[in-house]
């Protein structure tokens, strides 16, 4: 009797070979997104790009965020960048979105804007973002406040700003500081928060002092 040839199923060595490329963030299905919970997003850039905190690059990134903010406001989508900061080789954002799909599409669109602006600025082409972003839902007022401190004051861990508030962030436009701060004359690059947690809830734990540093 001729043995039957087996097709499909799990077999040792079967499937597409691995790329051998080390990935910073594991590729896995993203969890459920609750529209009432802002997300803290960390996004790394590829090695070889100059410090993102240089004036020219930080300006290009700020314009990309302002552009995506205007684009989504014009189209009345539920994706919003509400806080951000630029570090030497990565950036932090706090975003809102009405659905898991809107979150993914909004961040992918932002990634395209960032790549275009950064490549134009430094005269290169190709990949700019190193890997998938890492997104963490913020589910309590305390978690949102901690994330705002972490994002806006993160420069203290990397390249401390010479200014009272980090100019390479949305901090100059932030209205939750404990001390008065006149905003810049230019339009804010970020959107106003809509979720209760990001708009009001976090304030239960008090305003943020200029000298407050992120924990951890």
For every predicted segment, state its role.
Residues 1-39, 43-89, 96-216:
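Short Pro-Cys-Gly-centered "Cys-loop" motif that presents a nucleophilic cysteine in a tight turn
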């Amino acid at each position: 009797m001729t043995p039957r040839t087996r097709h499909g199923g799990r077999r040792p060595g079967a499937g597409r070979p691995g790329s051998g490329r080390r990935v910073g963030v594991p590729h896995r299905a993203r969890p459920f997104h609750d529209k009432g919970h802002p997300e803290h997003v960390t996004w790394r850039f590829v090695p070889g790009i100059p410090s993102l905190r240089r004036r020219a690059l930080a300006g290009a990134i700020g314009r990309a965020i302002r552009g995506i903010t205007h684009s989504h406001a014009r189209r009345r989508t539920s994706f919003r960048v509400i806080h951000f900061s630029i570090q030497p080789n990565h950036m932090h954002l706090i975003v809102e979105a009405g659905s898991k799909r809107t979150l993914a599409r909004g961040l992918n669109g932002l990634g395209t804007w960032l790549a275009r602006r950064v490549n134009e600025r430094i005269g290169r082409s190709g990949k700019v973002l190193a890997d998938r972003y890492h997104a963490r839902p913020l589910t309590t007022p305390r978690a949102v406040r901690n994330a705002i401190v972490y994002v806006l004051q993160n420069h203290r861990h990397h390249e401390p700003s010479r200014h009272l508030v980090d100019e390479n962030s949305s901090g100059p436009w932030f209205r939750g500081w404990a001390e008065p701060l006149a905003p810049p004359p230019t339009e804010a690059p970020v959107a106003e928060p809509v979720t209760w947690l990001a708009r009001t809830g976090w304030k239960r734990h008090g305003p943020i002092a200029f000298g407050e540093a992120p924990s951890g």
